[in-house]
């Protein structure tokens, strides 16, 4: 199910900008690549990349791409329902629930994703690559795979009490 970005009040955050080079016969062609995260701080977050000769244009393309890749995040209160591993390439991020008042404890790129997803109390640990693109995509992968007890109960056709035990 695709999420319509026009109905959401999205905020964007540029995670990284890098200069990339294409070597051709006549010399080097320089461009800028931007990694952008968008979210409504209410359970929706997406990541996108843009590339252009100028930085603002690369960021704009990244925002457009991120709006096409929105995912819904299960949030329980101000944290995640359970611990989860997110993986993408060599990026490996462990996302853990935290008690209220803890805040967002996460490194660089993962922090941007968690804040824009609307999580207020959560801990995250990067266990794999610290490449921003892999870290961001691993975090999004983990958040997309979160399920609340209600979701699981509905899928199994049971009550929440039967699931929790």
Swiss-Prot record:
One of the record's GO cellular component terms: small ribosomal subunit
Disulphides: none
GO molecular function, one term: structural constituent of ribosome
Assembly and interaction partners: Part of the 30S ribosomal subunit. Contacts proteins S4 and S8.
Summary of the function given for this chain in its UniProt record: With S4 and S12 plays an important role in translational accuracy. Located at the back of the 30S subunit body where it stabilizes the conformation of the head with respect to the body.
The family this protein is said to belong to: Belongs to the universal ribosomal protein uS5 family.
Official protein name in the record: Small ribosomal subunit protein uS5
């Amino acid at each position: 199910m695709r999420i319509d970005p026009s109905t959401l009040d999205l905020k964007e955050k540029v995670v990284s900008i890098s200069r990339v080079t294409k070597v051709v016969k006549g010399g080097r062609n320089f461009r800028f690549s931007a990694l952008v995260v968008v979210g409504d701080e209410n359970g929706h977050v997406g990541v996108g990349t843009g590339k252009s000769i100028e930085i603002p244009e690369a960021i704009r393309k990244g925002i457009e791409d991120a709006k096409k890749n929105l995912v819904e995040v299960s949030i329980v209160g101000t944290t995640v329902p359970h611990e989860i591993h997110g993986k993408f390439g060599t990026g490996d991020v462990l996302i853990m629930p935290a008690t209220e008042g803890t805040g967002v404890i996460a490194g660089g790129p993962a922090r941007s994703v968690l804040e824009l997803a609307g999580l207020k109390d959560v801990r995250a640990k990067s266990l794999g690559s610290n490449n921003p693109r892999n870290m961001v995509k691993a975090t999004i992968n983990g958040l997309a795979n979160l399920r609340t007890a209600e979701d699981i109960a509905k899928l199994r056709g049971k009550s929440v009490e039967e699931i929790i035990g």
